[in-house]
């Protein structure tokens, strides 16, 4: 008899609400921290674009929230899942879900700001 497939990923958060700068809580009371923010630039004809990608890691219950001296006040206070892969933010921006995966014991979301 074949073993059942095991999917360690939890459901995608529908809401991510900021509880402190760089720390979010979803509707299931799971805590997500900003692990990395990347910015890149690209040119399309005469237009220059900036892309912002945010890596969020879900903390394991009882895990201590690490101190992070970076300032994340440019990130939205709330993200809401609008469709299968788009989060709408309270500041009117849209963020594309690039990845929802498991890295060892760490569940991660990667969101990219959609401009234009």
From Swiss-Prot:
This is Protein TCL1B1. PANTHER family: PROTEIN P13 MTCP-1, T-CELL LEUKEMIA_LYMPHOMA PROTEIN 1B. It comes from Mus musculus (Mouse). The gene is Tcl1b1. One of its GO terms (molecular function) is protein serine/threonine kinase activator activity. Belongs to the TCL1 family.
């Amino acid at each position: 008899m074949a073993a059942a497939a095991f999917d360690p990923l939890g459901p995608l958060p529908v809401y991510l609400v900021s509880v402190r700068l760089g720390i979010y809580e979803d509707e299931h009371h799971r805590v997500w921290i900003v692990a990395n923010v990347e910015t890149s630039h690209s040119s399309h004809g005469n237009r220059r674009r900036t892309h912002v990608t945010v890596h969020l890691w879900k903390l394991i219950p009882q895990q201590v929230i690490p101190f992070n001296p970076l300032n994340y006040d440019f990130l939205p206070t709330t993200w809401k899942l609008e469709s299968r892969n788009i989060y709408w933010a309270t500041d009117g921006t849209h963020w594309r879900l690039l990845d929802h995966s498991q890295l060892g014991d760490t569940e991660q979301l990667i969101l990219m700001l959609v401009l234009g």
